UniProtKB/Swiss-Prot annotation:
It catalyses: Hydrolysis of successive xylose residues from the non-reducing termini of (1->3)-beta-D-xylans. This is Xylan 1,3-beta-xylosidase. The record marks 130 as: Important for catalytic activity, responsible for pKa modulation of the active site Glu and correct orientation of both the proton donor and substrate. The gene is xloA. It comes from Vibrio sp. It comes from the Bacteria. Its EC number is 3.2.1.72. Optimum pH is 7.0. The active site is at 16 (proton acceptor), 189 (proton donor). Beta-1,3-xylosidase that hydrolyzes beta-1,3-xylooligosaccharides to D-xylose. SUPFAM superfamilies: Arabinanase/levansucrase/invertase, Concanavalin A-like lectins/glucanases.
Length: 535
């Protein structure tokens, strides 16, 4: 029986995979944007089974994102290994909606182990996003980066530059040189350099990260070029198959196994259609990526010193696995009862977990969140969240909360962005009665999707959120036995990369526990458990 890789290998919001092999181990780094901690790090020994082993950016001294908007923050990390050290480049993008100019400070961090600790960041320029480092055989290191903006042209992507990097001094040296201006596909970004035999191979992403996304390859016998483009470029794209199961394919890089086989990592999206009879954002009628961009692998081979994808340009779901021993990992538990001193599979917005707003010790066995800003804020939000990784899933929690005013609220959220979310909240009405209500914000329009459900003086409620591909449905229970739907089925497509007119939508949907108290008193809520089950 032939063993296969099942794509996507990293499900849910895990874009821009950068892959590297170290001995018998494979590692992938993925983007995290405004979510903290920054840069997810994944590990495999067979390219089939993957596990999350940690994050690179865990301190605000490494990553300060306070005040950042949706889809700003950490763009496209590039992971390499040289001199017994892991090197990781990234951009912390500010003001991505700035047109001709963005603030895109880029950095490199290092670690002896993939699990860290990772160093403080070293600046490597502000040219654009998606920096990477290349380690040449002679010991020299080079920084590659895309250029953004600054010219009166319709395409703000100004090509790929390269500059030598002095690792001992921790600084760029010499002048940057443009080594590749891109092809007619446009939007040239994500440069990474590979050396094989007599050639340097520059691999870039082109076409933008929507349906025309693609992987471009060019080569040169000299590191500074000139670079010639692959004769059958692009080598990987979904653009020719509008309804490909893995759409948006691009942003790739190559890795060689210890047995001499080659694979390309790349991002992709699994789109769903609009619900029947419902039209939302007509320009995206070919589908919505509610899970965000994910990561996949394709088998590659070489011909005439050029890489090709073994199954053709369009990515496939089932891929022939390498000739390596299988190495599965233990499955993550579906339920977190908050007994351990740390949270599992959890992300927060823009800042790390802090005792000033979150505690696992003040009431052992419960997660205590202290209310701060509301969901629309770009600053202090008391939220812990988990990626949706399947189109059909159920999330459940038990909440204890004692609100006295409408300005104190806690509950369960389906979250894509500060202006793209649904929220089942427990709060109090103007009479001081405790109530449940489903609210939300879709593209800056606030909505109330249910009437108040008065629950008297109850301070405990069970909440459930079901994702059924195109719909979210909330329900509640006061005893954990009898459940009642609250509000209508809510369209899931607004909570997607294609769910709004803003082109800067690069993350994915999350299930989140959230508490707000805009009185400033930080009223707390206690959560007994958090359960996530896929169907």
């Amino acid at each position: 029986m032939t063993t296969t890789i099942q794509n996507p290998i990293l499900k849910g919001f895990n874009p821009d995979p950068s892959i590297v092999r170290v001995g018998d181990d494979y590692y992938i780094a993925t983007s995290t944007f405004e979510w903290f901690p920054g840069i997810q790090l994944h590990h495999s020994r067979d390219l089939i089974n993957w596990r999350l082993v940690g994050h690179a950016l865990t301190r605000t001294s490494q990553l300060n994102m306070m005040g950042m908007d949706n889809s700003e923050g950490v763009y496209a990390p590039a992971l390499t290994y040289s001199d017994g050290t892991f090197w990781l480049c990234f951009s912390n993008v500010h003001s991505c909606r700035g047109g001709n100019w963005m603030a895109t400070p880029s950095y490199v961090v290092t670690a002896d182990s993939i699990e860290g600790p990772w160093s403080e960041p070293v600046p490597i320029g502000n040219y654009g996003f998606d920096p990477s480092l290349f380690h040449d055989d002679d010991g020299k290191k080079y920084m590659l980066n895309m250029i953004w903006g600054g010219r009166a042209k319709t395409n703000f992507f100004g090509g790929i530059i390269m500059q030598e990097f002095d690792a001992d001094e921790g600084k760029l040296v010499g002048a940057p040189k443009t080594v590749f201006e891109g092809t007619e596909l446009g939007c040239t970004e994500g440069p990474q350099l590979l050396k094989k035999d007599d050639y340097y191979y520059l691999i870039t992403a082109e076409g933008g990260t929507e349906r025309n996304h693609a992987v471009t390859v060019c080569r040169s016998k000299h590191i500074w070029g000139p670079y010639e483009v692959h004769p059958e470029n692009p080598i990987l794209t979904s653009r020719f198959q509008e309804h490909a199961e893995l759409s948006r394919a691009g942003h790739g890089f190559l890795v060689e196994t210890q047995t001499g086989e080659w694979y390309m990592s790349h991002l992709c999206g699994r789109r769903i259609p609009n619900p029947e009879g419902y039209q939302f954002m007509p320009k995206y009628d070919n589908g919505f990526s509610i899970l965000g961009r994910e990561s996949a692998l394709q088998k590659a081979h070489w011909q005439d010193d050029w890489p090709y994808i073994a199954t053709g340009k369009t990515p496939v779901v089932e891929v022939e696995a390498p000739n390596l021993p299988l190495h599965p990992w233990p499955e993550s538990p579906a339920r977190d009862e908050f007994i351990d001193p740390t949270l599992s599979l959890i992300s927060t917005l823009r800042e790390p977990v802090s005792e000033k707003w979150l505690s696992l010790s003040e009431r052992p066995g419960f997660l205590r969140l202290k209310g701060r800003h509301y969901l629309y804020s770009r600053y202090e939000q008391s939220m812990v969240a988990r990626r949706f990784q399947a189109h059909n899933a159920t999330v459940e929690t038990k909440l204890e909360f004692k609100p006295n005013t409408p300005y104190e609220m806690a509950g369960l959220c389906a979250y894509y962005a500060r202006n793209g979310h649904y929220f089942l909240k427990m709060t109090a009405n103007d009479l001081g009665e405790r109530v449940l209500q489903v609210v939300g914000n879709i593209n800056d329009v606030y909505g109330e999707y249910s009437n108040d459900v008065v629950i008297g003086d109850a301070d405990t409620v069970y909440m459930r959120l079901e994702l059924k591909t195109q719909w979210y449905q909330y329900s509640y229970s006061l005893d954990g036995v009898d459940w009642y739907e609250i509000g209508p089925a809510l369209n899931s497509t607004p909570l997607s990369d294609e769910g709004g007119p803003d082109i800067f939508r690069f993350t994915g949907s999350f299930a989140a526990l959230f508490v707000a108290d805009i009185t400033g008193q930080k009223r707390h809520a206690d959560f007994d458990y958090f359960e996530y089950l896929e169907h």
